Amino acid sequence: MKALAKLKAAPGLEMTDVPLPEVGHNDLLIKIVKTAICGTDIHIWNWDEWSQKTIPVPMHVGHEYVGVVAGMGSEVQGFKIGQRVSGEGHITCGYCRNCRAGRRHLCRNTTGVGVNREGAFAEYLVIPAFNAFPIPDDISDDLASIFDPFGNAVHTALSFNLVGEDVLITGAGPIGIMAVAIAKHVGARHVVITDVNDYRLELAKKMGATRAVNVAREDLKAVMQELHMSEGFDVGLEMSGNPQAFRQMLETMNHGGKVALLGIPPSNTAIDWNQVIFKGLEIKGIYGREMFETWYKMVALIQSGLDISPIITHHFKVDEFEQGFAAMLSGQSGKVILDWR
């Protein structure tokens, strides 16, 4: 079958032929319809330090997808051939304390589709049936293909009660932009997002941001005054991994505020701990998606009227994958989708 793979320890990916994956007795074989390019795939494309330490070579990558069930193992129940599915890309052990307690997103033995094992940038993918998620008929292939990052946004944004709250989102990547729409949909008051990328800040405006602030030109505290915010933000969603953005978030949080961290700052990032301690801030790290509560919430949000479609800005046939990666690398895109049909 055709697959998009890292064939050598160097930047880029290559289209190649690989054997069809073997289907275990608890597995689903999924015929891929559409995939989306993730920021992780950009790291792999660039072959940065993290990728060099993490990605086995050769291997085909990718983990954002939608497809149809093309085969199943002898013990699989609850699925049928031709059914549309996406799937949770974190494969968990099922036996550690967190897995047995129903907290699979915290499994210490997690392996990642397209990171530690063969991925979805291929004509077919095999995953445990446990990880597959049926897609309702009223949700498009485009939206289903980005359920993985949409789930990151849902998990982060809904970590705290947002009703009537003032929310600061730092980082206008696709996940941060989707978090804007989620926060507004569930009843946040002001939703302010910061970045230095005007293209993506404009996307955030389309998704409902009260203010989209280019911090290279605008002062965040002046924006807060403009919005008559006298006490600070109630909830912070840090999506950038940028140390200065994180520091500014802590400075502008209200006392008793809550911060969710999805972005990954450098390990030597220094912050003013007085902001955390004397404000009584609550800081929560976010990883992946809750299995599978986040997935059910994604469906419910879309079916109740949440529109995240503006985040999808580019479509390419999979043979045009280099153009798709170029669009992502340019910073002038939202989500980029590759069509495998």
From Swiss-Prot:
Binding site residues for NAD(+): I175, D195, R200, L262, G263, I264, I286, Y287
Record-marked site positions (Important for catalytic activity for the proton relay mechanism but does not participate directly in the coordination of zinc atom): D148
Active-site residues per Swiss-Prot or TrEMBL entry: T40 (charge relay system), H43 (charge relay system)
Keyword match Oxidoreductase: yes
Superkingdom classification of source: Bacteria
Catalytic activity: L-threonine + NAD(+) = (2S)-2-amino-3-oxobutanoate + NADH + H(+)
Gene Ontology annotations for the cellular component aspect, listed alphabetically: cytoplasm
Cofactor: Zn(2+)
Residues involved in Zn(2+) 1 binding: C38, H63, E64
Family assignment from sequence similarity: Belongs to the zinc-containing alcohol dehydrogenase family.
Protein name: L-threonine 3-dehydrogenase
